[in-house]
Swiss-Prot record:
PANTHER family named among the record's database cross-references: GM01519P-RELATED, PHOSPHOLIPASE D - RELATED
UniProt topology in membrane: Lipid-anchor
Pfam family name, one: PLDc
Superkingdom, taxonomy of origin: Viruses
Residues covered by the PLD phosphodiesterase domain: 310-337
Molecular function GO terms recorded: catalytic activity
Protein species of origin: Molluscum contagiosum virus subtype 2 (MOCV)
CDD domains in the cross-refs: PLDc_vPLD3_4_5_like_1, PLDc_vPLD3_4_5_like_2
Protein name: Envelope protein F13 homolog
């Protein structure tokens, strides 16, 4: 794609939450989410920044321990700032209130231009502008212990500083400052990467002139796919929903279909199944699955956690293209997510890391917790009528 790349390696590690009910093997050299968060707290010396939809750590013992570690860190004269969505419940607010050096802020995505309601979906940590975590594990006890989650840990300081810029913009939005006060800057993007890695953002009102819109990052690689596209996610919804309208959003759906039908790319989708599965997502992936006939190599499987209760789901959000490019996020392929919600995703074209995440997808795809969607029965051959 004609990219410029800085010499700094991203040095990424896979981070996962694997519930006890999922006896899956953790990839070699990877970290558990609990250990990753604990490590970030231990390594921080001056500043720890955390963005998450909500803060509900006390819902599990492991989460409660992380909360205690954060409180201890703040009391040790380290600045801790937690930003959550304006609409989220203040489950841990009482414990966080009045702690020296700790700020608990709320961000209203509806303050962005256009005034459309939205949510903060970002889930990332930045420690001392030197190391970071980004993935699908929110600041909740479930994300640490009972919800299958995927993220990335890196000690690449240039990328950590770049992610800290996003956090600074979030802080200013919490202070209800105008958009002109936001820098919306970045050193790295789709055309200029750091160690083959960069961040992409949504919605478009948080892009500015240099950041990469997340949908554009995903589409660029889907449209360039040569052999394989593997996706693991909770939903694929080709719609943008407003309070009073629904609009069709075909960009991603069409790109996937074209890759399979026009370029013979193998497409595999592994979709998390739970009691809140989006009906439009199920319809969309079933439609893709039914296109897997003839030369079109398209298949869809669903991943269900046995005995799952409440929000115990497969919340892994992963895209692997040609075992050469990976995209890790906390957002689904959903038109409303791109149009209304605020999030940051991690993109990487380092082959060793891409292959490791490709192997993780293969593990999940082949596991006993994954089952194929049944295809519709083919129609009976039409009876040929002779015309006399």
């Amino acid at each position: 794609m004609g990219n410029l790349t800085s010499a700094q390696p991203a040095g990424c590690k896979i981070v996962e939450t694997l519930p006890a009910t999922l006896p899956l093997a953790l990839p070699a050299g990877s970290m558990l989410t609990y250990d990753c968060f604990d490590t970030l707290i231990s390594q921080t010396q001056s500043e720890l920044c955390i963005a998450s939809y909500c803060c509900n750590l006390r819902s599990t013992p492991e989460g409660g321990h992380v909360l205690l570690r954060l409180l201890e860190l703040a009391r040790a004269n380290v600045r801790v700032t937690i930003i959550v969505d304006e609409q989220s419940r203040d489950a841990d607010a009482t414990q966080l209130a009045g702690v020296p050096n700790l700020r608990y802020l709320k961000m209203d995505v509806g303050e962005l231009p256009g005034g459309k309601p939205g949510s903060l979906l970002s889930s990332f940590w930045v420690s001392d502008k030197r190391r970071f975590y980004l993935g699908s594990a929110s600041l909740t006890g479930g994300s640490i212990s009972t919800i299958k989650s995927l993220g990335v840990y890196s000690e690449c300081a240039p990328l950590a500083r770049d992610l800290r810029r996003r956090f600074r913009d979030y802080e200013r939005l919490c202070a209800r400052r105008c958009l002109r006060c936001l820098s919306l800057s970045t050193r790295f993007h789709l055309r200029r990467r750091c160690g083959d890695a960069f961040f992409s953002d949504a919605p478009e009102s948080l892009i500015g002139s240099t950041r990469t819109f997340d949908a554009d990052a995903v589409l660029a690689h889907v449209q360039a796919a040569r052999s394989t596209i593997d996706m693991e996610l909770l939903s694929l919804v080709p719609l943008v929903r407003d309070e009073d309208s629904v609009k069709y959003w075909p960009r991603m759906h069409d790109a996937l279909v074209r890759a399979a039908l026009e370029r013979n790319v193998r497409l595999r989708l592994l979709v998390g199944l739970w009691h809140r599965s989006d009906v439009f997502s199920l319809a969309a992936v079933k439609g893709l699955h039914e296109l897997g006939v003839g030369h079109a190599d398209i298949s869809v499987r669903v991943f269900a956690i046995p005995g799952a209760k409440g929000d115990a789901i497969n919340n892994t959000k992963l895209l692997v293209v040609d075992d050469e490019y990976v995209h890790v996020s906390n957002a689904d392929i959903d038109g409303t997510h791109y149009a209304r919600h605020a999030f940051v995703s991690f993109n990487c074209a380092e082959r060793t890391f891409a292959r490791a995440l490709g192997a993780l997808f293969e593990r999940d795809w082949q596991s006993s917790f994954s089952s194929p969607l049944p295809r519709a029965l083919p129609p009976e051959p039409a009876t040929l009528l002779s015309v006399n």
